[in-house]
Amino acid sequence: MQYRTLGHTGLLVSRLCLGTMTFSNGEGVYQHIGNVGQKEADELVRTAFEAGVNFFDTADVYSAGASEATLGQSFRNLGLARSDVVLATKVYSRMGPGRNDVGASRGHIMDAVDASLRRLQTDHIDLYQVHANDTITPIDETLRALDDLVTQGKVRYVGVSNWQAWKIARAIGVSAEKGLARFETVQAYYSLAGRDLEREIAPLLEAEKMGLMVWSPLAGGLLSGKFSRDNQKPADSRRSGFDFPIVDKERAWNIIDVLAPIARRHQVSPARVALAWLLSREVVTSVIMGARRIDQLQDNLGAIDLQLDQEELQALDEVSVLPPEYPGWMLATQSADRLGPVDLWGEALHS
């Protein structure tokens, strides 16, 4: 296993993270994602941990809290030391019928963290992430609440998921100005079939030294190997009944046309190649794997040892490249003849 620091911190996390959206009791809005019970969850956690995975991601909303409860019980059942795992969960989504049982307000955050701690059977959360964009709550209120949780020791680090780049940048600025705990990570959708974050979010992450946790690295199973131009709705795939995340299907078929031969060349699944491509991206800290079966998890774990050569990476880059979009194409045009500092210094040294 390989490890990286989590954002601009000293905390080391595995480059593959076990996602637990599939841990379910058959309730809540995520029940269709998977039906992994306690016994099966224990085996998935054990397999991941024995492969070197120390990073586990969940959310309060997954199966109405059952995912958190199952993961916490797995740690107990397996006798894993709390210090040996990095536990990430999320807050924002609706957890009750009340008007304030949702969002990133101080009140909801304070209630939600205590509920998550109880379900997870722990006294602290390593990474507490705001799961979605709250259009009502002021950023300052959210950040102050999160900072208080860090001060209290209930949370070690904080992150955010599914926010726009400008709002993440604003939050970083507010934290710096007011001395509050800052977002160290962004959890975002990123895959060969969905590279949108490269436009604005990836440059922000690099500039601010933030970590990137990737969700849906296989585009909801589209890159798993089950789908192709000639088999667009396989019967055994969740995506056939739940078409998410949104992708340009024609671009996706073109990507799969390139992905599949590379997988055959290495005698591995297309899923493993798609994950290996993500792991080759410098901006990626950790890729979240979701699995319902041990064989799926083991296949995903194999991506850590798969080395794609430059020709293969270039082929995947080219077929999945984003279409030009303003202001990106204008920036590239206007800066085409602009020398960088190293070039200028080099010329000066030799003049």
Whereabouts are the PLM-identified features?
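Glycine/proline-rich, positively charged
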Residues: E27-G28, I33, R94-D196, E200
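Aromatic-lined glycan-binding groove of carbohydrate-active enzymes
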Residues: L197-D236, S269
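Glycine-rich beta-alpha junction loops
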Residues: V91-S93, Q164, Y190-G194, S216-L223, ...
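Generic structural signal for well-ordered alpha-helices
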Residues: V45, E68, G72, V113-L117, ...
